[in-house]
Amino acid sequence: MNTRLRNLTITSQAFGFGVKYPEPTTLDQIYEKGARVLKAVVFDMDETLLSINLNAFILRYFKDVSSMLADIGHRSRGGTMARLGTILVDLNANRRSGTDNRTNLEFYQEEVERRCGICLSDPLIYEAFTYYDREVLPYKNDDVINAHAMPGAHAALQAVQDAGLRCALFTNPSFPQGAIECPMGWGDLADAPFELVTHMGNTTRCKPDATYYLEQLQVMGLEPHEVLMVGNDPKRDFPSPDCGIQTAFVGQGKPSRATWRGTMEDFARDFDAVIEAFYEHQVANELS
């Protein structure tokens, strides 16, 4: 007998008593089949946990970085910024062979050296950019970038923690570690209970490549069906090709692949409903 069934109603019959069980729910079905239990929730950062004018931040960051590169390499700032832009486009588009296992940071550094003639791995040069990320960039948040915690973000993290689930930050890894940790600070996320934060140095692909997601799950010892991704980007926050990771969508629009849709405040307030949607989606796939 299914031990999850509750509220039995007993009806008298001509001979003895009969027990009437309620119809099994979607969750009852998946528990009977052997639930693939949700173990972790992984979040995007920009416009998910962090409200930010991302275009303004990117422009500010890479304008400063390209100026530093130009000064170091004694090149024009305009030309250096253009070359750096093509490198970043290639990085984000994952334009490299499937057998290229360099980290995103190694790809970035080697392409800067090849196209701009500047060795970013040189200890003195590396230290200069690390200093910028950690000591200068934190003061760049202004009325234009306007970075702050997304309403509902901290409550969402608390809901995940209260549910006993693991948590990680799966932000697009097109920045070095220091430039990821900086906006985390703007959103008061530095002390969040993330087991893992993705950045250039610990990834080999960018979103939405499924390789990016699967590599990080391997580090965490998780399977795709044990994880819920939370993000706002209808392209980047849905692994391509589909690898079995479900996504709760907190952006604009109605992506057909979304397991659940709403705001971060909705996510925090209705987290039980989010979990139920996760299992309903899972059993629907099992039964299809």
Tell me the role of every PLM-derived stretch.
Residues M1-V41, Q158-Q161, F170, S174-F175, ...:
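Asp-based, Mg2+/Mn2+-dependent phosphohydrolase catalytic module
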Residues T86-V136:
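A metal-dependent, Asp-based hydrolase signature
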Residues R102-T103, L137-A168:
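Short, acidic loop-to-helix structural element flanking the phosphoryl-transfer center
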Residues L54-F57, Y61, A149, A179-C182, ...:
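Residues at alpha-helix caps and immediate loop-helix transition turns in enzyme cores, especially N-
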Residues G18-Y21, T25-G85:
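Active-site neighborhood of HAD-like aspartate-dependent phosphohydrolases
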Residues A70-T86, R114-T130, A190-L196, H225:
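Short, surface-exposed acidic
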Residues T48-L54, A93-S97, R166-A168:
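A ubiquitous short alpha-helical element
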